Amino acid sequence: MLSYTSHCLQALLGVASLPYRQYQAYSSPQAPLQVPQVPQAGPPITTLVSSCAGFSYPEVACIDRYGSLLQGEFERKVRNVLGDADTYISTNAPSEPTFSDLQNADFLVWNQSAAKAILGPNPHVDFMFSIEDCSHEAPVYVPTTNELYFSRLQQGFLPQLVINLNNDPPTLEEKLAQPPIYAATGARFRDGLLYLATIGGNESLAGYTFRPGLYTLDPITGKTQALLNNYYGYYFNAVDDLDIDHEGQIWFTDNDYGRPCQVNTYAPQINAATYRFNPKTGLVTMVDDTLLEPNGLTFSPDNKTVYLTDTGAGSAIIDPNIYPAPHIAYNSTRKGRTIYAYDVAPSRKALLNKRPVYLSMEYAPDGIKTSREGYLVSATGKGVVVLTDEGEPLVRVQTNFTVINIAFAGAERDELWAIGKGGVARIRWGLKGSYA
């Protein structure tokens, strides 16, 4: 969750082929070495953006050689605005006449051979709902009711937002849990219950006291239950995201974003970190504290790898003497726009072999899921990126709003719902998520 809240508070590159050059052998000291030169102007030698076989253009656009060489002069102007940063397609490349076609593309294809199965025969991106122009989080599909739950990060806002997928077109409503859940940012469905990570903290909101932590919500009865709300007496700062392993242990991130999002009255008491919680025994153990702002978390399909997103490019003021806390400050040059992979120890009690796998091409990677094939799917800026498990980009989905979190939905989990700042989109394609 890399949040944007001001409106809510008012309401409460392609490659050109180089020309072949024959290198001249050194037959004498005077023989010059002929080095090929990168062309700086003129018409492109290759087409940077083109149609993808079997798909309509420019809705689906293939980018030559990952866009690694742009002809002539080009510039991507940095826009360090939280929730509205610069994008790949905002790059100005006047010597690449096809680059502007990306403005009208729904899908950018980096790897054409992999994209065919990812996109399926008839991919679509549909803008479904216009919502408040602030952060929305914690999307999760409930197969027992065929609904998609998500939350709004607005000071004092307690209902859950629910999309009813039984209706055509789907409809959006509010449901208030008992007791309410405040500012959920991560969610999973297991064994009939929603497991929610929350960043909301307040001593007297609607007659309740809220603390960041882990909670369950029964979507049938609307009843909630607290699972975890402290680390040996310390409040958590902002329990942001979670996943549940095949043994039932809950792994979750805790960052500094609750107070600058204006949904937590307390400044951080402990450092940002990632934890493992055993709901059977109550034991909570830190497993990593190396990320600036640990955010999204997901397991690989075989549960042997954990992927974490670091959104430390969005920094928070943690000084309790500064009140109210300023909003999160985003800067693209700050470390923390990265997805990391870790091996899960055989004991399933620790994380090993941390390595970076992806530096976001837009904004910072926030919510993250894995597909059945093991692809990484992450909310990044104005869209969603699909990566190999080693971080190679395959496909990017473009949206008209900043996406903060995502969830697979539908009976076959072949729809991806993207939730974010001001909008909700549905992506229908060939990629499928896990049933768990």
Curated annotation (Swiss-Prot):
Its EC number is 3.1.1.-. Pathway: Secondary metabolite biosynthesis. The keyword Hydrolase applies. Residues 1-27 form the signal peptide. One of its GO terms (molecular function) is hydrolase activity. Keywords: Hydrolase, Signal. It comes from the Eukaryota. Belongs to the SMP-30/CGR1 family. Lactonohydrolase; part of the gene cluster that mediates the biosynthesis of oryzines, natural products with an unusual maleidride backbone. The two subunits of the fungal fatty acid synthase oryfasA and oryfasB probably form octenoic acid. This fatty acid is most likely activated by the acyl-CoA ligase oryP to give octenyl-CoA before the citrate synthase-like protein oryE catalyzes condensation with oxaloacetate to form tricarboxylic acid. This is Lactonohydrolase oryL. It comes from Aspergillus oryzae (strain ATCC 42149 / RIB 40). The lineage of its organism: Eukaryota, Fungi, Dikarya, Ascomycota, Pezizomycotina. The gene is oryL.
